[in-house]
Structure formats: C-alpha cells, structure tokens
Amino acid sequence: MNANLSPQELSEAISAASDTLSRRQNADGHWVFELEADATIPAEYVFLEHYMDRVSPERQRKIGEYLLRIQGDHGGWPMFTDGEFNLSASVKAYAALKAIGHDPAAPYMERARQAILDHGGAERANVFTRIQLALMGAIPWRGVPSMPVQIMHLPKWFFFNIWAMSYWARTCVTPLLVIQALRPSGHFPQKIELREIFKTPPEEIRDWIRGPYRSRWGHVFKLIDGALKLAEPVLSVVARDSAIRKAATFVEERLNGEDGLGAIYPAMAYSLMMYDAMSPAQGHPNMAVIWEAIDLLIVEKEGEVYCQPCVSPVWDTCLSGHAMIEAASNGDPGVSAKVDAACDWLLARQITDVRGDWAEIRPDAVPGGWAFQYRNDHYPDVDDTAVVGMLLHRNGNPKYTTAIERARRWIIGMQSRNGGWGAFDADNDREYLNNIPFADHGALLDPPTADVTARCISFLSQLGHADDRHVIERGIAYLRGDQKPDGSWFGRWGTNYIYGTWSVLCALNAAGLDHTDPTIARAADWLLSIQRADGGWGEDERSYDQNGYVENKESLPSQTAWAMLALMAVGHAGHPAVERAARYLKENQKEGEWEERSFNAVGFPRVFYLKYHGYRLFFPLFALSRLQNLRRSNSKEVASGF
C-alpha cells in the first residue's frame, strides 16, 4: 500500500474528525472535555466528605469502583496509566477505600497494604498526603512541616513569602496556614484507623522529614523546621490572629464563586476546611458556594465517579478552534460558523478588569489575559492567552482587534528577566524554595519554561509588530540556551520532550528562523529518530523521572500529531515520516475519533500527571488538516504561529 494518503483518504479522515469534534461543541460555542488525574484527587474528595460529615454513600461507592479499576498489578496505585507503584497515591487510595467501607481483609486491600509497607510505610508518604492524614487524626501534626500562619505578614523582599510561590502553591498554602494554626479535628463520625499501613506507630515516629535532599538547602530548611516547631508555643500567640485574618481576606478576595479558589480542587478543599475551622459550630456562609464549585468537578459515568483536579474549557476551546479553523478548507461550510462561535465565547472571557496576583511582581503590566478554566480572574496564564490570541488573530474579524492588542501588551509585560516566560507569574524562580520541607514535591515555583516561552514567541511573531522584535529575540535566546544535547526541549505542561520540541519548532518557524539553522535541524533530526515503526510517536511519563526521552509502549494520536505539526512547521511537510504518521492516524481512526489510553500531560513533573480527554480528538484533526493545506499550498510553509 502507498504510504501516502490519497487526497480523498485525507479528506475523509478530516471530515469524520471534524464532524465528531463539531458534535462535542456546546451550544454557546465552547468545548470542554474531561481532565483526569490519578487516584489522589478522588481519594481526597472521599476524605473531604468524611471530614465535613457530608457523606454521599452512593457517590463514595462509585468512587471506590473507580479506584479499584485503576489499581495496579503491583497492588498499589500509579501516577499514570501502567505506571509504577506510587507510595503517596497508594496511601490515599487505600485510606479512601477503607473510609468508604471496604473490608481491609479483602484481597485487593491486603495487596495494597503489603505494597505500602514494602515501600517504607505511610510515614514515608509526601507532605500533602501527611497533611490529609493529620486532618484525619491518623498522625500527629508534628508529622507535617511547620508553616506558621505569620508567613502572611512576610514582605515581598524577604527570602520566603507567599508571593515567591507559584499561584497553585499560594492558593493551597494560604488556607493551609490557617488550618495548621487552628489544627481542627473535623467532623468525622468515626475515626478512620490506618495504623496497619505504618511500619512504625505514628506517635513514635520522630524523623518525618528526612532525605535525600535536592541540595544543601534541604539540610538548612530541616534545621529551620525544627526551630519553628520548638517556637510553636510562642508563634501560637504572636501576631497569630492578625495573620489568620490576613489569610482569610486573601481567600475571600479570590473565592471565585462557583469556580472556586484558584479554580483547582486542592485549593477549594482547603478553603472549605479553613472556613469550617474558623466557624466550626455554625459554619461559614462561603462554604455553600465552595461545595458548589467542588461538585462541578465531579465526573460520573459507567457506574464510576471521579473528581477532576480542575476543568479546562478555555484551553479545550482554543485548541479545538485551531483544529477547526485549519479544517475549514476541507469544504464544510458549517466549520467557520463554529469557529466564530468559539471565538465569541472566548472573547467574553478575557480578563480586563482584575489585576491578579501577577501584578504583585509586574505592577505596570495591563490586564488582558485568559485563564484556563471558566473563571479564574486572579490567575490568567500566558499560555492560554497566547493560544487564544493566535486563534482570534487567525479568525480575522476586526471586533477581536482590541482583545488581541491587550493580550499582546500583557504577555510582553510578563516576560521574565532571563527572556523566557512562566505560565502565571514573572520571575517566579527562587529555586532554593523547592528545598523547604513543605515542598517535597519540588513544584513550589513557576519558572520560565520552553513550551510556554515558545507559545508567547509564536503569538508575538504571528502578530508581526516590528516593535516586538527585541522581546522575541530575548525569548529565542532563552530557547537556544534551554535546548537539550539531543536537540529536544523539555515539556513542562505536556508529555514531554515531544511536546516541548513541537512547541519550540512552531515558535522558531513563526519567528522567521531559517529551517537550516542548527537549532532547528537538530530538533527535527531528533523527532525523526524517535518515530515508531507503526508511523506514530509515543512518549512515556517516565521521561520525567529519567530526565530524557522514554518511549511509550504504544503510539499516541496526540503525540503523533504534535510531531507532525513540528516537522511541518520547519519545512518537512513532504517528508516520508510525516506521510507515515498521517497513515497511522488514518488507520487508527474509528468513527471520527481516536483512542488514547495513556496520560498525555503533566501537572507537576514526577508528582502529578494528567490525561486531557480532548487531545485525542482535536490534535489529530489539526495535524491532518495542516497536512492537507500544505499539500495544496504553493509555498509549503506554515504561515501561522501555531
């Protein structure tokens, strides 16, 4: 069989995928797909219902079914599909199943318990797991690193303060500071006994914080933690109440209605427990709307329930819009109308009247970004903003001009000192803070990364303002310095080196670099070298642990599409590898869509991974449509930034 798809085959695949994606669009123009993580968020939701004595037995039963389905052959729970045993996820899942009412003597519980003990016991779980255990009364509070609420009073110039953290850390830590200060016991109708998963009785453990440490800073911060614990009697008095009020005000100002604090589950749950701790008898009026926000994260299907970490409507809509605008040339007259509806929906969600947390570091920047979720006005991100801006610009309707310009100005204002961009904040790069005991996940910060930087360069280059060239050049210099020896780039928000390399090659092409530039050539050669025998590409989440590319055991439609888009961006539209990839996508398409078992993104490398359920739908459509358009073009060059 000819490896190249015929024009008819390609058109049929595009039509089927476009029809499928069109049917998933909501009446108001937006798309939103499931965003799935591992066992930890559903387990934490179980704890929350028990903590608040608001248990839904049927929902909990279905969460139990979900947890059992994703239990690994090793007896525990992984962080991603077919992943290795993860201690913290396994402790949470086991505890959740026990809270739901599963018999500890059941074979699957025995396997989980033994696996936990074989990996050091629950006492070796990470900090956020131990926080949950402390809230449940399963361990003493000394098992959690000390974080005095007086941190709220520390100024921005101090070596540690809440503004030095990433947005996700800030929105979680602030209510947690109040919880730690008040140390509530919750409303558990009955204590959940978990001593059987500890190798040492919790009350006898003294070395809750121990190495290996990432650097010498780890030893320093452990000593500081010990000193803070000794000082707790004093800290319980000095400036405590005013710090609690300041933390509560911070949360109140960012409560965000039915979208929740930070629009992420952990921050919502901690804010709920914070208010409960502050008003344990009568409750707090804000608690009702927080419960509403959490309920909107619940997914129920096929007898199972899980809780999403957040929702992704802006991201899903702008990416679907790019796929559809690329597919419009296939001849379906309804596609353009769907893109227009998506653009109008996005336009209404630009954040122009709120100076979010980003303004603490960039006070002169003008608001103009988009958030990832439905509403998260204090926390727009430059990644979503750049991708939305490119879609509105490609649409070409003059009514979007002002919004695009505001996005441009905000993104320029958010560039970091080193020329790159972080997602939510500028210069959020005090790396020593990742060594504090509270940050054993190593994800306290939001430093510049290649994928986000690339998106900003793509956007600014697509707009083509001559005055922005110096901004773009600084970004390019950052990307050149961040390239790995094999030619790839790290992917902070998608898996992993394929995602990062796709992002950067699109940007370098948009910025006008010659495709023979060694930076581009090395990256393209790397992508070509890792194509799989079936024509697809597939990278495993283990690449984050290995600090280098790790092949998945199967090709992923989304990653295949990224590789195709990357190669086409730098002049390889006619390369046999691209044609083989198109053949792979065509042959694996079923009723207009693709299956994708594996996780395809990351929340925190080595700690928390994600599966975007929409990636398998819109990215292959995007890539196949791009190939069709380049086949038909005279220049064979990608003219857009994305």
Predicted regions and their residues:
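Preference for long, amphipathic alpha-helical scaffolds in soluble/luminal domains
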Residues: 1-642
